Amino acid sequence: MSIPNDLKYTKSHEWVRLEDDGTATIGITQHAQELLGDMVFVETPAVGRQLKQGDECAVVESVKAAADVYAPITGEVTAANPELASAPEKINQDAYAAWLFRLKPANTADLEKLLDSAGYQKLLESEDH
């Protein structure tokens, strides 16, 4: 499985990409979508919602299970991916392109607490055992 090097990751399988405009784009990882299977529903947080790192903020539902998505960093939701309401399967097609929501980070230092691609790879290897 390919793990993009330009993203940060959480132990609960969310990814974060810091954009040029200072916002952070968030989604679930390829590993998470493989575990869940075919997506049938996605609930994203409301624009304007204030999130703290670790807050439950979205839900992804598949034919197998529903899973909470946690805010990887603290900030204000600035956008939610409108395509996922009618086409949740986009997450299965490309988990790193089918973002869930965007935040304006309250503190970019939160990103330093997240895993890089090598750290995330080690996490996946430890979960396989």
From Swiss-Prot:
GO terms for biological process: glycine decarboxylation via glycine cleavage system. GO terms for cellular component: cytosol; glycine cleavage complex. The glycine cleavage system catalyzes the degradation of glycine. The H protein shuttles the methylamine group of glycine from the P protein to the T protein. The modification N6-lipoyllysine is found at K64. The glycine cleavage system is composed of four proteins: P, T, L and H. It comes from the Bacteria. Residues 23-104 form the Lipoyl-binding domain. Keywords: Lipoyl. PROSITE patterns: BIOTINYL_LIPOYL, LIPOYL. Binds 1 lipoyl cofactor covalently. Belongs to the GcvH family. InterPro entries: 2-oxoA_DH_lipoyl-BS, Biotin_lipoyl, GCV_H, GCV_H/Fam206, GCV_H_sub, Single_hybrid_motif. The gene is gcvH. Pfam families: GCV_H. The lineage of its organism: Bacteria, Pseudomonadati, Pseudomonadota, Betaproteobacteria, Nitrosomonadales. Its cofactor is (R)-lipoate. This is Glycine cleavage system H protein.
